[in-house]
Amino acid sequence: MALLRKINQVLLFLLIVTLCVILYKKVHKGTVSKNDADDESETPEELEEEIPVVICAAAGRMGATMAAINSIYSNTDANILFYVVGLRNTLTRIRKWIEHSKLREINFKIVEFNPMVLKGKIRPDSSRPELLQPLNFVRFYLPLLIHQHEKVIYLDDDVIVQGDIHELYDTTLALGHAAAFSDDCDLPSAQDINRLVGLQNTYMGYLDYRKKAIKDLGISPSTCSFNPGVIVANMTEWKHQHITKQLEKWMQKNVEENLYSSSLGGGVATSPMLIVFHGKYSTINPLWHIRHLGWNPDARYSEHFLQEAKLLHWNGRHKPWDFPSVHNDLWESWFVPDPAGIFKLNHHS
């Protein structure tokens, strides 16, 4: 009898323990579910779409980068993450410029670019040596520098953004396209200024059609070129199509065979992109890349046209922080003074 009573006590104890465990799990699960529900309810605000913008900051023209960033940040309410790319010896200066100026509120990451990846891929001779600067080729290596984003915007440093960058980010890329660019034949006003300053806007202006490797591509020399100073890129497609490796292949072929020259279209970075992306890119709204402002200090766009433009690009020799240049007032309104006093404007001869 005593044994039976003891067994019943043990069973009762086990039953109580089991009930306690079940009750604990239910309460704990309810708490976790509630937290999950809270997280889900907060997701739309907390996980607002992040727009990655990649821009380079070269030592001698860092003021250009900061002006571009200022113009982007000031003209949008979107959640922008700036990837500011520089060489190792400039990284500290980049951070100080941002953190000790009006740009301190921006969301940014500083990325180091190792120029050793370019070894053996660039011809040393050039009529425009500034185009051989390592950072000019950062756009070739976007997936190696930026990892967690599906879609990325790349901008040259000599641009000013007057529109909401979210509009550019919303550019539709066709299925199978790794990037979107702006065609060089896409605006009547652009064509007018092309004639005025003698610019090339076809493949003939960038590639040496006397060379067999170029002829074998089967690309008509009259094909309209595009400008890779503004890029909307799909990182998944870029990696899937091995775009970086294709670009490197043509860089190496150029070293061996001199297939394109900076003396043609001034495009040592543009030319391989024209080859690799021929017939396989989407287009950007022309107003999001109004360019050639730096080609001729005597060639000007109309004020009305400039006001309509979403993005201005001073590609060419005549930069808006230097003399001579055109429409530099539009650029200077976004200039962020260098806290270190190194970068200075030069608007007088």
UniProtKB/Swiss-Prot annotation:
It is a single-pass type II membrane protein. Pfam families: Glyco_transf_8. Keywords: Glycoprotein, Glycosyltransferase, Membrane, Signal-anchor, Transferase, Transmembrane, Transmembrane helix. This is Glycosyltransferase 8 domain-containing protein 2. Residues 25-349 are lumenal. The chain crosses the membrane at residues 7-24. One of its GO terms (cellular component) is membrane. It is found in: Membrane. The lineage of its organism: Eukaryota, Metazoa, Chordata, Craniata, Vertebrata. GO terms for molecular function: UDP-glycosyltransferase activity. Its main location: membrane. PANTHER family: GLYCOSYLTRANSFERASE 8 DOMAIN-CONTAINING PROTEIN, GLYCOSYLTRANSFERASE 8 DOMAIN-CONTAINING PROTEIN 2. Glycans are attached at residue 234. Its EC number is 2.4.1.-. The keyword Translocase does not apply. It is an enzyme of class 2 (transferase). Belongs to the glycosyltransferase 8 family. Residues 1-6 are cytoplasmic. InterPro entries: Glyco_trans_8 (IPR002495), Glycosyltrans_8_dom-fam (IPR050748), Nucleotide-diphossugar_trans (IPR029044). The gene is GLT8D2. It comes from Macaca fascicularis (Crab-eating macaque). The keyword Lipoprotein does not apply.
